[in-house]
Regions:
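Helix-coil boundary/capping segments in enzymes
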Residues: 1-111
Length: 111
């Protein structure tokens, strides 16, 4: 019996979703180049806006997906968590992840 990718439905447990401005900052960071022009981090294969990423996942038979995110510096976790909350209200198949920056003074309030 032969199967193909579209014979199945998937849960993607490792998808990153961030507010667009944070996505852009992360992509810029990971694609920094050295003095020879080589990428020091790694290339980002799917540079898609959150709504486009949702559509791409749907096109691949992904029925549920995480918002696997992280705070990369002080003071952004609360903003990311609020964005994720709103995103998941709109996208019922999204499995929300929250994040925390250990040194945020208000971390207990936003967790």
């Amino acid at each position: 019996m032969t199967f193909n990718h579209f014979d199945f439905e998937y849960i993607d447990a490792h998808t990153h979703f961030f507010p667009p401005q944070i996505f852009n900052a992360i992509w810029k960071y990971f694609e920094q180049t050295d003095e020879k022009g080589n990428i020091r981090g790694w290339p980002i294969n799917y540079k898609l806006a959150p709504e486009d990423l949702v559509q791409f996942l749907k096109s691949q038979n992904v029925k549920a997906y995480t918002t696997y995110n992280y705070a990369h510096k002080e003071g952004v976790a609360e903003f990311i968590n609020e964005w994720v909350k709103d995103f998941c209200i709109k996208h019922k198949n999204a499995i929300p992840f929250g994040c925390v920056w250990p040194e945020d003074q208000n971390r207990l309030e936003y967790v």
